[in-house]
């Protein structure tokens, strides 16, 4: 049966007990309102560890002004049931005072230069500082051997990998594959913001990503690929933040079209901001 913990000393006692037994511990950080994509991360983590801790904490420092912190969906009972079914051993539920004992205004920030300053970093200034700050705190609280993050937040995963390497966290970072609905929409906690009319339109993001991949693969210039993608999304009713092709480290590719690339999209449909990506 899954254990639920709200006290840091109890969490550390549990994890330390596991480690004394020689068990590997994994962490799956979340903000709750969990779906199949989150549960797939628990199952991925289980392949690399003997015990899995998932955290649920809606982190105020990664939300910008006029974003959805206050109304971010919270579904604690369903989350607990789903985590238990997925094989999670412990649920860590810190409150704001535990996570930020000096208050958010005095929290020591962590910034990952370069990778956190482009794309989402330009659209949501300070977002990744909040992500790095809370993830580093979760790492210190749980002391995991392994941590799993979803590839849907491709840039977030890259930012966390950079932070872990630079700050020498002794933690293996796993990237979990994107889990999609039948029509291709990437699963996201924010999908429930979509209206009944918007929901079928939202699947166009994945269709456009596939078009970007196929067009780029036959040698279409990158600028032309990106312009066509933005136009297709706008025609479908989106307001586009970006639709780009990048190298895996999120730098801009040169003239060659060989090697690994990733197409990334962020766009708004009504009041809902959606992000997705496709590696190729």
Swiss-Prot record:
Q: Give the residues the record marks as binding ATP.
A: 31-38, 150-153, 179, 187-190
Against Pfam families, the record matches this protein to: Pantoate_ligase
A GO MF term = pantoate-beta-alanine ligase activity
Where primarily located?
cytoplasm
What keywords does the record list, in alphabetical order?
A: ATP-binding, Cytoplasm, Ligase, Nucleotide-binding, Pantothenate biosynthesis
The entry's beta-alanine-binding residues are 62
Reaction(s) catalysed (UniProt annotation): (R)-pantoate + beta-alanine + ATP = (R)-pantothenate + AMP + diphosphate + H(+)
InterPro entries documented for this protein: Pantoate_ligase (IPR003721), Pantoate_ligase_C (IPR042176), Rossmann-like_a/b/a_fold (IPR014729)
Residues in the active site? 38
Report one GO cellular component.
cytosol
Its GO biological process terms? pantothenate biosynthetic process
Enzyme Commission number: 6.3.2.1
Q: In which pathway does it act?
A: Cofactor biosynthesis; (R)-pantothenate biosynthesis; (R)-pantothenate from (R)-pantoate and beta-alanine: step 1/1
Localization recorded for this chain is:
Cytoplasm
Q: Which residues bind (R)-pantoate?
A: 62, 156
The entry describes its oligomerization and partners as: Homodimer.
What is the purpose of this protein?
Catalyzes the condensation of pantoate with beta-alanine in an ATP-dependent reaction via a pantoyl-adenylate intermediate.
Which PANTHER family does the UniProt entry name for this protein? CYTIDYLATE KINASE/PANTOATE-BETA-ALANINE LIGASE (PTHR21299), PANTOATE--BETA-ALANINE LIGASE (PTHR21299:SF1)
Quote additional remarks: The reaction proceeds by a bi uni uni bi ping pong mechanism.
Family that this chain belongs to: Belongs to the pantothenate synthetase family.
Q: What is this protein called?
A: Pantothenate synthetase
């Amino acid at each position: 049966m899954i254990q639920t913990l709200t006290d840091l000393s109890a969490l550390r006692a549990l994890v330390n007990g596991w480690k004394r037994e020689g068990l590997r511990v994994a962490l799956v950080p979340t903000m709750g309102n969990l779906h199949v994509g989150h549960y797939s991360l628990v199952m991925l983590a289980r392949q690399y560890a003997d015990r899995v801790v998932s955290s649920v904490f809606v982190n105020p420092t990664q939300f910008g002004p006029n974003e959805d912190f206050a109304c971010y969906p919270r579904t604690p009972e369903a989350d607990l049931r789903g985590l238990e079914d997925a094989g999670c051993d412990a649920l860590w539920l810190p409150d704001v005072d535990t996570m930020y004992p000096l208050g958010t205004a005095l929290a020591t920030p962590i910034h990952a230069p370069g990778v956190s300053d482009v794309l989402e970093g330009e659209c949501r200034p300070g977002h990744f500082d909040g992500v790095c700050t809370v993830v580093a705190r979760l790492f210190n609280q749980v002391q995991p051997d392994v941590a799993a993050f979803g590839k849907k937040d491709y840039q977030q995963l890259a930012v966390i990998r950079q932070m872990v390497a630079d700050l020498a966290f002794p933690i293996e970072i796993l990237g979990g594959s994107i889990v999609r609905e039948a029509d291709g929409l990437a699963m996201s906690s924010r999908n429930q913001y979509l209206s009944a009319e918007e929901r079928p339109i939202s699947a166009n993001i994945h269709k456009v990503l596939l078009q970007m991949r196929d067009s780029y693969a036959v040698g279409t210039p990158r600028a032309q690929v990106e312009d066509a993608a933005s136009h297709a999304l706008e025609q479908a009713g989106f307001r586009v933040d970006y639709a780009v092709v990048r190298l895996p480290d999120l730098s801009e590719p040169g003239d060659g079209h060989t090697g690994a690339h990733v197409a990334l999209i962020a766009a708004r449909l009504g009041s809902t901001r959606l992000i997705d990506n496709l590696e190729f």
